[in-house]
Amino acid sequence: MPRYRMTIEYDGRPYKGFQAQASLPTVQGAIERAIQAFCGEDVRVNAAGRTDTGVHALAQVIHIDLEKAWPAATVRNAINAHLMPEPISVLEVSVAEGDWHARFSATERRYLYRILNRESPPALDRGRVWHVKKPLDAQAMHEAAQALVGHHDFTTFRDLACQAKSPMKTMDLATVRREGAEVVLEFASRSFLHRQVRSMTGTLAEVGIGRWTAADVKAALEARDRTACGPVAPSDGLYLTAVRY
């Protein structure tokens, strides 16, 4: 039974997250229906990251096991054809080696968050950025973000509904930079807690507008208390950008 590794991108706006849910539109559900239409097999899609409602992906990694062996290009093209007009695209397909697993073999996941920082609202990127009117100090945000790098208890930045066994995570990267009218945040870790990136982003935005200081972010992290978190950023600007193995 061949295992196919796929890299996909999607616009998360129409979906109630990646993970399949009965009677609700999800990315996983759309892909599984496309596969069934292609080859008649009922399969389960496994993903590197189970993104939330409205979250996008530029390079989500998934795998499926099929009874029949197909050329990788055929799998890609057929699934894409049956996905239309869903805003999901299979970019790459290859046959996985050994016991490789999209979720459990991953060693790093990267997320990017886009904040549109200007007075005027977005027209073309509505639903793809978080619009913040007040001027943000990206350098101050970046400096504050460095308190998040390393191995920490991230209870403060963990959603109360998070089902992870432990709040301990190692943040390998936390950067903030300005690109014209946008402030872009990037985070890298082996894995993340539920709504961790959005919680950190919303908190760092408080630094950007001058309500919080870098010391406040450090104190919030050390509090290990969800009530110490700043506002949670909306899903609109969040993208899964890379998975490493």
Model-predicted segments: where are they?
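Structured-RNA-binding interfaces characteristic of tRNA pseudouridine synthases
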Residues: 1-245
